[in-house]
């Protein structure tokens, strides 16, 4: 079942895709044979089929334990892929202001801001909270600092022996600082798989435990990913929309060094952030790659719209449109009509939003000459999001290999870390 429809008619001449059929087939075969650079991190591509049922049961049991214990807030501590996947999924499925009463999920360890961490500690001070700390090694500075502070707060309130019941570590299977700490202190543990990099980890316990605690059906999420995987593992470029997207981007980057991912739903903001990390870290190396940028329309049409329409031609857009939103609202007629909006009577807000989407695509492509790739999503369900995660992950792997870079490492981020530790005189 296709939950995502790709439209390239306003972006490229689709005949050009045929020139890459052979290369894409070769790359796909090598990915399947684990014979490409970075093969040791290809575990994500078969996650929906291979994830352990016992692990899913354990995740759901942990979420149910927290609910039974009356946990009001789960503090998820992690940075980058250790929080963006879960946060993006919660907002995508439930909206920015969830209407159902579920355990609240907050995220810490995403910065070194003293104000941010202090306010988060104050926020949970009088609430019953649990901690899910996520780090492969346990040495990443931002989550390590946050974990120390929240751990100390929980220990001071409950005593260390009782507090450990409400701390879960998602980390390496058998090594690392966090693994050793969790083992020594008796924290429950989930595993970050060795063959799955952080930015690809949303369908592992890294993303699944926070999502289960938030009341999201993680089995449906995985089911949607599994359905999509059957489509996106196809080596035939002309039948594989994820690979078509990758090739379209590859063609466009020859002229446009920036890609702006756009959505007309504000609750997709963290989906766009997740996508930026996925593509930015996977492609941006050896002086190559497309700069990933993002915008929420119609909001950002009132700030960036002028530049996109009339500014320097450095970008193409990939636009996400959702056919069926979480909620819709109909405009009712008012007798006085002081705001002169009665011409919209009986139109739904989603209809108006779609008109804005169509008008903007036409303006940007026909007048502004900005290529637009359209991704039309069926709805905001778990299954659709699972499919979208696999779509982007398959696409970025192919895109990286087309650029002749390893999509699964990120050597550039080590430079600032090394400098930081020198300044802090870490031995």
From Swiss-Prot:
Main location: cytoplasm
Any GO MF annotation of the entry: monosaccharide binding
Cited SUPFAM superfamilies: SIS domain
Record: active site: 281, 302, 417
GO biological process, one term: glycolytic process
Top-level EC class: isomerase
UniProt family annotation: Belongs to the GPI family.
Free-text function comment from the UniProt entry: Catalyzes the reversible isomerization of glucose-6-phosphate to fructose-6-phosphate.
Protein name: Glucose-6-phosphate isomerase
Encoding gene, per UniProt annotation: pgi
